């Protein structure tokens, strides 16, 4: 009985064992095979997601079914021109380019496979090669590609199989370039050597069946000679037959098809990224929407709401559009209403493809057509946002400009990569600090956080001076440079790129914020080169704020941008073989740590949040003027003060420190003049502080500043100055309490009797040239400083009597106190010429400085040399040369 009761349980156990054994033999291998296929098919779309991959995204997408083609539409296969020629220098012998962009490294050679691609590599069953085309092999002659045509532009990112998971299918985009026999060696060759190499697919050039020019070797191009087609213009038949060729030979091999001109430039990486976000199984017709010129409106046979894609920037067709449209090309050729091939292609797509060119406004930016005034057939201005945002650029009819544009695009990419290296150095330095490990020397040099305070000067001659600039002019105190000059092309280009990157950072999240900010102009700015770190900018930008969410608003705003272009690691390429051992021995080991300094590409980075300048800083400026005698000069100063401050009602206060001798008679006129202005402007703040004894500028300024609180903004001024309103604003902007003191470099006039040849001086004092004056870069008397910073630095040395030296002493104290002196040319102030009288009783050091200042005010070195030659040699020179 016990044995019989166990029989059902033994049967169940035996059945389970047999069932699991059969499942492992029959079912498990099939499941593993299906999982492997699914993994291969989905890995190609992992970057953009399954929804953007079209019919290859998964099994739920039905495969497109080929349509039957009318017999009369079948044309004989076009003749293929095997144009033999030297291989392109960029191509490696026997290796197909696997790069989807020029900066992606190709996979190892062993990852390539012979024959057709395996099923799952593209998401579709492996398609056989086109009729008459041999399968691609690994080995081959230099420049050989598929179909045996030399120089064929069949590019891609990988072919599946053993490729890396990030590899993408090669057969993604087919580009047909329309050209003519006369342009094969110029425009077509330029396109092949520039953008065509970076298309994620194949690029072929379509021309007529005419024989090439006799006596000239054909260029190394993949040329398709269309039968029965010539190079006449307009190329309507050529365009339709090229589209038919794409359909007949590559419909099931590529997802997207593009018709392009030979004078267009295409950014392959941006185009691939854009197209992978769309579904090629849907009928899509992409390009810049066109309606015709103003003269042609109503004459193109377009109904209201109909359009076409302009042929210049390029037309892009999805696979489904070609599947629907091409069987009816014969009917489209017989029923044309205009001579414009792009209009007729658009009409055919709309009629038989079931779609038309997209109406999206953004297409005008992505497919860029150059509408510059007085177009010359090439894109001249490269430093603007339109060039950077575009995918295709048209036209560049001259090959030299095509190479120029390509070189600029490569340089932009190099700059982005170098900036990325700087970011990585910063991250590495930060992680070393967080992990309490030693920071490498390279990270110490290149991973520093941007700042204006990397270099702390210890003496006044170590202070790096700033150059003042406007949108068109540069004011510099550098040796052997004119004080006022136009912006050089190099500096203008650098400013354009700088502003362009600033605007990209400002508008990075413009769509989500519902606003857009446009650049108008540079109001003014400062620039200097820190040889240890990079170029530094302070720019006052005039912008337009446009709000497009909610209540629409457009207002002008100003921003104060603090920027730095950092030096990155230099890269060298030796054109000759060098003896490394002898080279190492000849290099000083002490200079190796500074090898990162070079005149290399600089990358813009924002290291301080842009300070919005919606309204001016209206801090009250307290103008302190020490004075003794010189009533006529004081009268001129007060007239200028009235025009610049009293009439415009500037937020200023004038303090006159009036020194007088024992008699006091020489100060009575000054007091009456001040009282007259006080009566005329009762609300104006003007104060006169009388002082007895010998003149001491430092003592007078120290006594006057002692009457104000610590938050007072002080301007130490001289009676010989003529200034404008903008100088007062820059005094406010460039002085930062506790951080920065503004030391403007003043333009000083020469003796007008010498510069004008005895003629009376002009009324316009603000004329900057080598003939009229010079930048007083050795003067530190004019200062904008807060009272608290003056006290922190130690104040003036009141023991200094007479002329000079007190300003140099205060400047040294400012540096030693840790404050940052801001030095730049100030175009809003001019030091008017006056005869200098040096007292022999002065301190020897002061007396020597006074004589040097007196000698520098006569005239320029060139003018003095001319005067001497005229007097002693009787030779007349042209004074305008200076």
UniProtKB/Swiss-Prot annotation:
Give me the glycosylation sites of this protein.
Answer: 155, 279, 710, 878
Keyword vocabulary terms for this entry: Glycoprotein, Golgi apparatus, Membrane, Metal-binding, Signal-anchor, Transferase, Transmembrane, Transmembrane helix
Q: Which GO terms describe its molecular function?
A: glucuronosyl-N-acetylgalactosaminyl-proteoglycan 4-beta-N-acetylgalactosaminyltransferase activity; metal ion binding; N-acetylgalactosaminyl-proteoglycan 3-beta-glucuronosyltransferase activity
Main function:
Has both beta-1,3-glucuronic acid and beta-1,4-N-acetylgalactosamine transferase activity. Transfers glucuronic acid (GlcUA) from UDP-GlcUA and N-acetylgalactosamine (GalNAc) from UDP-GalNAc to the non-reducing end of the elongating chondroitin polymer. Specific activity is much reduced compared to CHSY1.
Cite the record's tissue specificity text: Detected at low levels in brain, cerebral cortex, uterus and small intestine.
Cite the ranges annotated as topological domain Lumenal.
Answer: 29-882
- The entry's protein name is Chondroitin sulfate synthase 3
The gene coding this protein:
CHSY3
Give yes or no: UniProt keyword Cell inner membrane.
Answer: no
